[in-house]
Amino acid sequence: MLEPTPMLLAAFSLGLALLPLLFFLRRWGWLLIGWNECILQPIHNLLMGDSKEQRILRHVLQHAVAGDPQSVLETIDAYCSQKEWAMNVGDKKGQFLDAVVQEQQPSVLLELGAYCGYSAVRMARLLPPGARLLTIEINPDYAAITQRMLDFAGLQDRVTVVLGASQDIIPQLKKKYDVDTLDVVFLDHWKDRYLPDTLLLEECGLLRKGTVLLADNVIVPGAPDFLAHVRGSGRFECTHFSSYLEYSLWVVDGVEKAVYLGPGSPAQP
């Protein structure tokens, strides 16, 4: 029988010591987000003299194929999985988004939170002829990057980037943007805005029977009040899709699909 070497014993001891940390990080995946967004990213920005979002755009412009949305998505996914983590919906959870757009064939689609334009490109590439996507982004730098990403992908005619806060823009959708009701809403902005904006969409008469809400990151960072509402109000039929945090293989996350049943609908069993 082989005697354990000091190096092997040290590695085993280190592994045991790190197990609680690994469990903690798996359970509290927001620490991964905090580490990337609050520590690594500011250091990288300082050293590089630009922002992560600008670096993502530059990488796409240099390495993706112009006019090819799939190439744009794959280039962003490769960068964010290999170089710098970013809060896109990502390739794995993006498949749920693809499925909703393909199933619903929406005429009017709303996105809350554009970030760098990844999900806008992902949805717009699947829209049927004549359909349109409105994407609301509060950060002017992100909105500008999203527009450039859409232009590069050749999707600028299908998407309108709206700069502003969701709570300010939503009440303007009917009159200013000629929206009657929405077919699909993708929520991927501030998680504490998921519930207020869902209620605002209802209040403004923008949801019809069958409107699909798809909400990202309902586990990490989490949107418990939103989940409680759509699952408990009786006005939505919900399906949860378990997955992992974007560009992570071990932080459990999920996407919630909530189909609007109409006001005053009976509670679902």
UniProtKB/Swiss-Prot annotation:
- Which EC numbers does the record give? 2.1.1.6
Regions of this protein lying in the Extracellular compartment: 26-269
- Show the stretches that span the lipid bilayer: 5-25
Name the reaction it catalyses: a catechol + S-adenosyl-L-methionine = a guaiacol + S-adenosyl-L-homocysteine + H(+); 2-hydroxyestrone + S-adenosyl-L-methionine = 2-hydroxy-3-methoxy-estrone + S-adenosyl-L-homocysteine + H(+); 4-hydroxyestrone + S-adenosyl-L-methionine = 4-methoxyestrone + S-adenosyl-L-homocysteine + H(+); 2-hydroxyestrone + S-adenosyl-L-methionine = 2-methoxyestrone + S-adenosyl-L-homocysteine + H(+)
Which loops or segments lie on the Cytoplasmic side of the membrane, by the record? 1-4
**Can you supply one Gene Ontology CC term for this chain's record?**
dendrite
Pfam families linked to this entry: Methyltransf_3 (PF01596)
Output one GO BP term. Answer: developmental process
Which residues does Mg(2+) bind? 188, 216-217
Q: Name one GO molecular function term.
A: magnesium ion binding
Give residues annotated as binding S-adenosyl-L-methionine.
89, 111, 119, 137-138, 164-167, 188
Entry-linked InterPro entries: Catechol_O-MeTrfase_euk, SAM-dependent_MTases_sf, SAM_O-MeTrfase
> In its keyword annotation, does this UniProt entry include Translocase?
no
- Family the UniProt entry places it in: Belongs to the class I-like SAM-binding methyltransferase superfamily. Cation-dependent O-methyltransferase family.
Record PANTHER family: CATECHOL O-METHYLTRANSFERASE, CATECHOL O-METHYLTRANSFERASE 1-RELATED
Official protein name in the record: Catechol O-methyltransferase
Q: Which organism is it from?
A: Equus caballus (Horse)
